[in-house]
């Protein structure tokens, strides 16, 4: 019995070392791949980026590119507009350091309970990184890279700069990228004139723009 226990402990110890080595190599590779990444707000917003939009079942529904857009300063937006996006997308945006680990743990628990991956846990900072620097593949490597780059972003930008950049590049459906273009498209007015209901409508589009679009024909 003691011999079996001893062998089990040795095997466990060896496996732990192997996993640790693999983990170190994995993280080191990601750090090397991201070490030269720098952030420039104007370049992020103005850069042309090919974007694929997928339906809930993973089918490609739109393939388009986002060109340079007029930057809408955060200071031009009403508090109600800003608060709508924070309330829906990231309530603790100004409190966390880019990654909300408590939110991630809660989402993982809920997904396990529901046997699905319906609930996400990405902060606004993570969403910005995912939409401007990474692909849409759902792999551990991409997620870890997202976290690493998010940490770098939080050091390079202020919270207001991150939120401003996010609002100027995020996809709102119907080919609209950025709050100014979405506001003009859906409500025929500049973003600075959005009221509370209009702001809430736009904020609600981000999670599933193809489903919640105000222009969608729900009777068909």
Which sequence ranges carry the predicted segments?
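Juxtamembrane regions of bacterial inner-membrane/periplasmic proteins
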Residues: 2-220
């Amino acid at each position: 019995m003691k011999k079996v226990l001893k062998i089990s402990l040795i095997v466990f110890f060896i496996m732990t070392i192997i996993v640790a080595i693999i983990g170190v190599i994995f993280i080191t590779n990601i750090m090397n791949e991201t070490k030269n990444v720098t952030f420039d707000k104007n370049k992020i917003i103005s850069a042309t980026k090919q974007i694929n939009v997928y339906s809930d079942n993973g089918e490609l529904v739109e393939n388009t590119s986002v060109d340079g857009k007029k930057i809408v300063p955060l200071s031009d937006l009403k508090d109600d507009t800003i608060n709508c996006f924070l309330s829906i997308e990231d309530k603790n945006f100004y409190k966390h350091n880019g990654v909300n680990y408590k939110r991630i743990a809660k989402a993982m628990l809920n997904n396990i309970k529901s046997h699905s991956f319906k609930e996400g846990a990405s902060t606004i900072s993570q969403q910005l990184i995912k939409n401007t620097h990474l692909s849409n593949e759902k792999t551990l490597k991409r997620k870890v890279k997202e976290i690493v780059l998010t940490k770098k972003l939080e050091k390079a930008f202020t919270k207001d700069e991150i939120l401003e950049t996010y609002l100027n590049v995020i996809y709102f459906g119907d080919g609209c990228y950025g709050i100014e273009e979405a506001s003009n498209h859906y409500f025929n007015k500049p973003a600075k004139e959005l009221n509370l209901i209009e702001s809430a409508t736009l904020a609600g589009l981000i999670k599933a723009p193809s489903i919640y679009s105000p222009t969608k024909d729900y009777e068909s």
